[in-house]
Amino acid sequence: MIQLLALKRDLKVEIREKFSIIEKRIGDKDVLLKEVCNEVVILSTCNRIEIYFNSEKNRKQIIEEIFSKMGWNINFLENFFYCKGDEAINHLMEVACGFDSLILGEDQILGQIKAAYDTALKNKTSGSELKKLFQLVITCGKEFRSISMLNRIPVSSASIAVNKARQENLRRFMVFGFGDVGSLVCKYILSSDFDVLYIVVRNKAAVSIKDKRIKVLSFNEKNSYYDDVECMISCTSAPHPVIWEKELPYRKFTIFDLAVPRDVEETVYGRNNIDIYDIDQISMIDNNNRKKRKEIMMANRHIMSKYIVEFYDWQKVQEIVPDIIKLKLYGESVNKRRYETFKNKKATKDNDMLVNMLIKSTSNVYINRAIEVLKEEQLKGRGEDCLRILRRIFQK
């Protein structure tokens, strides 16, 4: 059965970051959990850790094994919620469509779900059920966004941070990291007027934006440019801070920390001349489009139901897959016997007559058996039901 073990939504970032997984380690964790689960996909973002898995083990045992493999202290279990079956499937659908995001309808989660699925595929940790579920979830998320046209009012932590900086008339930026979030931050900054943008990365060659207002820096160079900056937006995947209090000049800054674990040293939060927002505070910033997005999303919620039903229908069909395989194997054996007969007799018989005889013999195998079953079912009082099925099979 498909199950879910996930961090609760209302946890503070200080707690969430204790369980964060570095992006490049997610595949390794998938493989570790596959040792105790039949199949597994880990969805890890700045706002969530969700482990989707399939297992026949009892709840207590599998949760303890997952915690052990992840290196988590079981005493922190109270920070997690668990569900299975319908509830787990519905939850993933809601996540994909943006209903479960701290920033309602945010447009990054679908890409993150696809990345989680691709990682599981690459590491061979997803089996048939999770493969089918994630394929339908991704398709559902795309259709939901297309029909609801949420792209007309896009929202993400990146857009909220940049818009907030605009409202405060900040024009001199420094962005840390140029991954999915960092590149999105830069895109939003570039979409409007600004004075200067410093992009701090480990590999300077990764940034190819051509704009005289942009300067690409290494992490070793960043400190020399702090005095020229009004706003910092940090979104690296580093497991440790990249903005340290001892390195910051004693002057006013506005800092948006979009990372989990946080990129900004905790003592910086105590500086009274620095306005700093972590990912939770960014999610709470008033957004004029929130009510409108919610109305649009609720009006299109039925799209999820269609894909949930499709998944349940697929599950039902899987119950008879072994019988379908047996039917196909039986058909192959019937074909093989008649082909062998043809090979052995084609030199001594009229081929047209031989082929006609073998084709008729092949059809008789199924027709005669169907007649036998129909007679048996008629005697048992189930003839009408059997006949209705046989008509669907043999009559158009």
Curated annotation (Swiss-Prot):
Gene3D superfamilies: Glutamyl-tRNA reductase, N-terminal domain, NAD(P)-binding Rossmann-like Domain. NCBIfam families: hemA. The active site is at 46 (nucleophile). During catalysis, the active site Cys acts as a nucleophile attacking the alpha-carbonyl group of tRNA-bound glutamate with the formation of a thioester intermediate between enzyme and glutamate, and the concomitant release of tRNA(Glu). The thioester intermediate is finally reduced by direct hydride transfer from NADPH, to form the product GSA. GO terms for biological process: protoporphyrinogen IX biosynthetic process from glutamate. It comes from Clostridium acetobutylicum (strain ATCC 824 / DSM 792 / JCM 1419 / IAM 19013 / LMG 5710 / NBRC 13948 / NRRL B-527 / VKM B-1787 / 2291 / W). This is Glutamyl-tRNA reductase. Homodimer. The keyword Protease does not apply. Keywords: NADP, Oxidoreductase, Porphyrin biosynthesis. Substrate binds at residues 45-48, 101, 106-108, 112. Belongs to the glutamyl-tRNA reductase family.
